[in-house]
Amino acid sequence: MTRFISAVALAALGLATISGCSISVDGDEKESVTRQFGNDYVGIGGMVNLTDPVAGDAFLAAGQISIASEVQGDLVAAGGEVSIGGSVGDDLYAAGGDVQLDAMVTGNARIAGGDVQVGPATVIAGAVSLTGGRITFDGNSHGYLQASGASVNLNGQVHGDAEVRAEDLVIGPETRIGGRLVYHGPTAPVVPEGAVIAGGVEFHESEASRFLDNEGGPVAETVRWVGAVLWFVGVFVAATLFLMIFPGL
């Protein structure tokens, strides 16, 4: 693990100081490279499918990512299409064009993408932060839920409070919120029959345009956050290449 930490340090220094540098790998666009560093796992390429359990953290960057196994530590995944099943033993960080979550998460979950879907099989023990263009939450959060997007659809369960910033909020009949719902948007939300919001609804009127092009809106926030995640994953990608090229490091 010491070799990998050294490689990460060198990679981070390189990425921080050489902004114009890029690395390419010739071959099939679906080809992937995976490496195990102690208990930690790194996967990069056109397509990464994680089906074996990981005893530590997992760092994945690919055009298509599919996870159907247990990750005992943190999971960091960035790609065009990201599908997460199985379980995460600590925190989850995911970013992509389309992100689908159907997993057990022991820690917190932070997800950003163009289309973010949290399925009904999802149980998150900690807090949840969702940012994107279109967000659907049908899961179960034992903590706090924060969602920012052009459109947000809630039809899941939140044990704590929920805060939503969106141009359009749809509350489904299966919605269960143990605390209060704070909504920032152009019009007051409609709470359908069957939905339960124990702490009531607190509405703050906001202009719809804020959610599309304002610097503080979810689109801008998504771009910034995805950029940060990609840089972080890029450090581990570069570290992987360091150890492949210089195995004696």
Q: For the regions a protein language model found, what residue spans apply to each?
A:
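Intrinsically disordered, low-complexity terminal regions
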Residues: 1-249
